[in-house]
């Protein structure tokens, strides 16, 4: 939805620019990352069927008319069990605190469940403008949607309610227009052609982590992380990328490698294809799997992921 251009010359009343930060808050798998990618028009946040995919704040940027909207995709709000969980939830609330507008994303298909109710309760004292976004509405009957919207608005005084499908884009244009009209007047925060503030090295690692999530099941992906250790631009215009998949135990390493290395090879092929499409360059991707016990308690790993280490 980057369909605007920066106004030329001095600002007038008709062309005055707007800009602001919009945080997306919701339970895991509510569709926050899918919505960010839909509004931005390309992938800036990874999406899988697994919950708790987003770990750190990811900012996606789109332009709507004279407005530049910075979307802050936060980790899902849930009851933390591990140190990493605590860091993710703390980061999510931190992202909301600094935003001009908060989008509260609820999976309409999941209904008004315990997670949704707890999330709404926590939003009562939030002072920023709050917008309710019911996602996945294409899978729910209209009477159920209306009932869900009514219950949510009885708990929290939302400024607006939108019903969308982040996956197919239904309702997203209206949401984008509303955000563009609602962010404050002011200069743009980022250059016109920038769609994210995530470094390419980190995005490449996130893409590989996404393919790891999609390929493997159970708890293994949550005991793993991916880091880009080398990025070399080559004379022929291609790029050589070396990444390390860290796991906590030798048994997990065997699962990631697979029989004769077939699993990690498939992960690498899928990641290489997508990274190449984003860069519009030939990519030579090399994956290594290493055991690092208790990486989830290593402050350095948290810094790599853009998280504060919880004490």
Swiss-Prot record:
Annotated region described as G4, given as residue ranges: 135-138
Keywords: Cell inner membrane, Cell membrane, Cytoplasm, GTP-binding, Membrane, Nucleotide-binding, Ribosome biogenesis, RNA-binding, rRNA-binding
Membrane topology: Peripheral membrane protein
GO biological process: ribosomal small subunit assembly
One MF term in the entry's GO annotations: small ribosomal subunit rRNA binding
Superkingdom to which the source organism belongs: Bacteria
Species this chain originates from: Brucella suis biovar 1 (strain 1330)
Entry-linked Pfam families: KH_2, MMR_HSR1
Domain spans labelled Era-type G: 18-185
Chain segments carrying region G1: 26-33
Domain KH type-2: 216-293
Protein name: GTPase Era
Residues binding GTP, per UniProt: 26-33, 73-77, 135-138
Assembly description: Monomer.
Positions of region (G3): 73-76
Protein purpose: An essential GTPase that binds both GDP and GTP, with rapid nucleotide exchange. Plays a role in 16S rRNA processing and 30S ribosomal subunit biogenesis and possibly also in cell cycle regulation and energy metabolism.
Family designation: Belongs to the TRAFAC class TrmE-Era-EngA-EngB-Septin-like GTPase superfamily. Era GTPase family.
Gene that this sequence comes from: era
GO cellular component assignments: cytosol; plasma membrane
Entries under InterPro entries matching the protein: G_ERA_dom (IPR030388), GTP-bd (IPR006073), GTPase_Era-like (IPR005662), KH_dom-like_a/b (IPR015946), KH_dom_type_2 (IPR004044), KH_sf_prok-type (IPR009019), P-loop_NTPase (IPR027417), Small_GTP-bd (IPR005225)
Intracellular or extracellular location(s): Cytoplasm; Cell inner membrane
Renumbered residue ranges of the record's region G2: 52-56
Signal recorded as keyword: no
């Amino acid at each position: 939805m980057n369909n605007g251009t920066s106004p030329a010359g001095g600002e007038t009343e008709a062309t005055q620019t707007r800009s602001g930060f919009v945080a997306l808050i919701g339970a895991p798998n509510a569709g926050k990352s899918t919505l960010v990618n839909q509004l931005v028009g390309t992938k800036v946040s990874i999406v899988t069927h697994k919950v708790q995919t987003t770990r750190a704040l990811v900012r996606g940027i789109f332009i709507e008319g004279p407005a530049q909207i910075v979307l802050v995709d936060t980790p899902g709000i849930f009851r933390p069990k591990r140190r990493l969980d605590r860091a993710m939830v703390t980061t999510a609330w931190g992202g909301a605190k600094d935003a001009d507008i908060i989008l509260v994303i609820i999976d309409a298909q999941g209904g008004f469940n315990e997670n949704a109710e707890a999330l709404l309760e926590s939003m009562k004292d939030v002072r920023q403008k709050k917008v309710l976004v019911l996602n996945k509405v294409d899978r729910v009957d209209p009477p159920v949607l209306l009932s869900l919207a009514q219950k949510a608005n009885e708990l929290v005084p939302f400024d607006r309610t939108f019903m969308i499908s982040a996956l197919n884009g239904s309702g997203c244009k209206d949401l984008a227009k509303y955000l563009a009209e609602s962010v404050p007047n002011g200069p743009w925060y980022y250059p016109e052609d920038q769609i994210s503030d995530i470094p390419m090295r980190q995005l490449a690692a996130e893409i590989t982590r996404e393919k790891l999530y999609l390929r493997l099941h159970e708890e293994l992906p949550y005991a793993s992380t991916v880091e880009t250790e080398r990025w070399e631009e080559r004379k022929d215009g291609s790029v050589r990328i070396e990444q390390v998949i860290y796991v906590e135990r030798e048994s997990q390493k065997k699962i990631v490698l697979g029989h004769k290395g077939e699993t990690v090879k498939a992960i690498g092929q899928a990641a290489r294809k997508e990274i190449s499409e984003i860069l519009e360059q030939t990519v030579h991707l090399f994956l290594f799997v290493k055991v690092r016990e208790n990486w989830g308690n290593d402050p350095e790993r948290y810094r790599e992921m853009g998280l504060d280490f919880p004490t």
